[in-house]
Amino acid sequence: MDLTKKWHRSEFVSHEMLEVHRGIECELDFYSAIANGEIELVQENCNEQAFTNPEGMGVLSTDALRNIRYHYVVTVALITRFCVHEGLEQEKAYNLSDFYILEMDKCKTIEQISKLHDVMCLDFCKHMHEIKNGQVLSKQVVLCLSLIHI
């Protein structure tokens, strides 16, 4: 069966099973809260364990552990880009991203990945909180500095 036929069959089955993904607004609001350094909001979301709630979560793998790993990597990548866009120095953001993905590789359970997810989100958020509340430099200056290789 070619991929187009497989895709159409998959789409039909999803439609018939009434499978619906979570609304993108909640996800974008969460990433924005991190990028804006809103620690309390991010902590609340982490406490709700929304990351591991299977309702509305896409299926990136039929293996539950692999599925959460893939979602984790996507989450880290998006948070990294949101934070860079809001003023986190690019190299620092990518180093944080790499660090947390490598740490996730060591996790053996969904629970370990979930805990690491919360730590990672709050770490990025705290970096952004410091930038937003103590930044003397404009976003444009931070961008220029990230382009200068010393």
Residue ranges and their predicted role:
Residues 128-135:
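Short alpha-helical interdomain "coupling" segment at the junction between an upstream regulatory sensor module
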Residues 137-142:
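Short, leucine-enriched amphipathic alpha-helices that occur as contiguous helical runs
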